């Protein structure tokens, strides 16, 4: 009974502590448990004594486990602080909700860092092996969806480091030797961006191939070329499609340039000034396939130029996609109807049964503004930051990660749309016969006859005005009608008029000449098949 009374006193003491700490959700749950315990303890039976002893031991175990867990999740910078971080601050400052996507690169960088530490005798080989094994196990767990990322640990770096320490003990605490989260996050971002440039290049290549395939299949199809959305000159549909292939080629070139500038390792810069420990940044750079090491430690941790440059590349890509989408949205219209997009890539209306909407194209066009916004966000984010690292930089990942995901999705889905779109060649040809689209060919005919171009331009303008008045095309005007405006016009004028003759007579390099377009298709087929 004495033991029982003593135990009961201890139990009530624990209850009191739990109620005082009731603001904590875990302690609050315990309070409910102890309310039940109080009731049991008021019953003077031997069963109550047994229940009391069991629950006392159980609660003490929980207290021990929770205390140990709290110690493991202690902030890495907690030594300077006398109070725990407010829950609101943890929620506001965490980045794990978005930077978890960098886990593979964080682990890759940590393995390289561990290898370097062992090479420089800053840790033992046994410690290195334990680190590498533990990091690979964590990577496997994340891939399998079994790893729990915790907001209380702020970011991807501390989540992985904490998990490593939990696995291998004190050896894990040595991983951060000669490293700061400042150079660590810069490394992660560089590794991620480096991979992204290569993935995006491949995706663009796939889109180019679809466009070239369509160009080859529709070689000979004539369509109106537009300026100011007005009929201008006839062109080949293939020539039009290859224009976007050229745009995407420049996008790929920009990505390659971006790769060259970002492919430097920041490891070794630490917080901003380097380290007094003897390390080997060249080793980690080579291990991670970088071309070299950042030459200035302050620049290494504060540089986000590569993020801005990549965001600019993404913006250019999105802009090119949006231009194509804008045109094809117009071409889907029943008044134009140059193309038919597969039902699988369109949607309908909730109220109008007949509707078939090009929503995919519209969304790509709409998402382009979002990508532009991320580029602007990065520029504004960095414009006022003093050297070196500032917490503002945490927001760079929000912008660049979303911009990349958006453009990757847009490029991929547009490749599918292109592959599943049909062209109405007859409607395109019919539209090409409107709007005096062969007028420039007539002006150049006069130039060949010795008429100065400005005079030829005026003569043809007068002829067009006359044709509008009498409701006829240029090719339908009688020879006498032409001669009324210029005596140099002969019967051979009809060899340059009409859209087919216009297309046949193009000669300049890079023009819509059928022979040149065919050669360009062959060029792109070979180039894209090489990768």
Residue ranges and their predicted role:
Residues 176, 181-184, 228, 232-235, ...:
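Alpha-helix capping and helix-loop boundary segments enriched in small/acidic/polar residues
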Residues 113-123, 239, 246, 308-316, ...:
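Short, well-ordered beta-strand elements within core beta-sheets of diverse protein domains
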Residues 292-376, 380:
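Acidic, glycine-rich loop-and-beta core segments that form the ion-binding/anion-interacting portion
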Residues 72-109, 170-171, 352-531:
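Glycine-rich cofactor/substrate-binding loops
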Residues 72-274, 279-285, 292, 344-349, ...:
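A helix-coil-helix interface module used to build multimeric assemblies
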Residues 103-106, 127, 131, 196, ...:
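Amphipathic alpha-helix face/heptad-repeat signature
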Residues 113, 134, 138-141, 163, ...:
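Generic, well-ordered alpha-helical scaffold segments in large soluble proteins
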Residues 1-21, 31-39, 43-71, 428:
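Short, low-complexity, charge-dense intrinsically disordered segments
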């Amino acid at each position: 009974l004495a033991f029982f009374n003593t135990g009961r006193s201890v139990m009530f003491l624990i209850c009191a502590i739990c109620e005082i700490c009731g603001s904590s959700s875990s302690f609050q749950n315990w309070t409910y448990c102890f309310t039940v315990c109080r009731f049991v303890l008021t019953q003077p039976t031997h069963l109550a004594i047994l229940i009391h002893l069991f629950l006392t031991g159980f609660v003490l175990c929980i207290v021990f486990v929770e205390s140990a867990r709290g110690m493991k999740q202690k902030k890495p910078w907690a030594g300077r602080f006398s109070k725990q971080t407010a829950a609101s601050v943890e929620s506001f400052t965490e980045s794990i909700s978005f930077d978890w996507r960098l886990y593979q690169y964080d682990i890759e960088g940590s393995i390289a860092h561990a290898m370097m530490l062992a090479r420089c005798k800053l840790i033992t080989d046994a410690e290195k092996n334990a680190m590498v094994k533990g990091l690979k196990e964590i990577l496997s767990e994340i891939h399998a969806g079994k790893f729990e990322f915790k907001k209380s640990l702020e970011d991807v770096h501390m989540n992985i480091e904490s998990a490593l320490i939990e696995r291998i003990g004190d050896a894990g605490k040595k991983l951060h030797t000669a490293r700061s989260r400042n150079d660590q996050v810069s490394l992660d971002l560089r590794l991620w961006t480096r991979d992204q440039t290569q993935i995006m290049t491949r995706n663009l290549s796939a889109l180019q191939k679809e466009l070239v395939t369509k160009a080859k299949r529709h070689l000979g199809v004539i369509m109106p070329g537009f300026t100011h959305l007005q009929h201008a000159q006839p062109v080949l549909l293939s020539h039009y499609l290859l224009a976007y292939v050229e745009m995407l080629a420049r996008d790929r070139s920009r990505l390659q340039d971006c790769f060259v500038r970002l492919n430097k390792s920041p490891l070794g810069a630490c917080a901003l000034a380097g380290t007094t420990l003897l390390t080997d940044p060249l080793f980690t750079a080579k291990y991670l396939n970088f071309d070299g090491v950042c030459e200035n430690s302050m620049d290494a941790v504060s540089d986000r130029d590569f993020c801005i440059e990549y965001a600019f590349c993404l913006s250019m890509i999105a802009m090119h996609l949006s231009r194509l989408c804008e045109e094809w949205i117009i071409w889907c219209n029943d008044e134009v109807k140059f193309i038919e997009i597969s039902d699988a890539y369109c949607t309908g209306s909730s109220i109008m049964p007949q509707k078939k909407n090009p929503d995919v194209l519209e969304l790509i066009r709409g998402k382009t503004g979002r990508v532009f916004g991320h580029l602007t966000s990065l520029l504004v984010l960095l414009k006022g930051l003093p050297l070196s690292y500032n917490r503002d930089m945490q927001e760079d990942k929000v912008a660049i990660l979303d911009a990349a995901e958006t453009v990757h999705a847009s490029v991929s889905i547009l490749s599918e749309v292109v592959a599943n779109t049909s062209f109405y060649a007859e409607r395109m040809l019919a539209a090409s016969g409107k709007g005096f689209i062969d007028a420039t060919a007539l002006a150049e005919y006069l130039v060949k006859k010795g008429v100065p171009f400005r005079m030829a331009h005026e003569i043809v303008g007068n002829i067009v005005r006359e044709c509008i008045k009498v409701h006829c095309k240029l090719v339908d005007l009688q020879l006498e009608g032409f001669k009324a405006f210029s005596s140099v016009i002969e019967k051979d004028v009809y060899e340059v008029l009409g859209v087919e003759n216009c297309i046949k007579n193009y000669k300049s390099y890079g023009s819509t000449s059928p022979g040149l377009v065919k050669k360009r298709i062959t060029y792109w087929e070979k180039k894209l098949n090489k990768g």
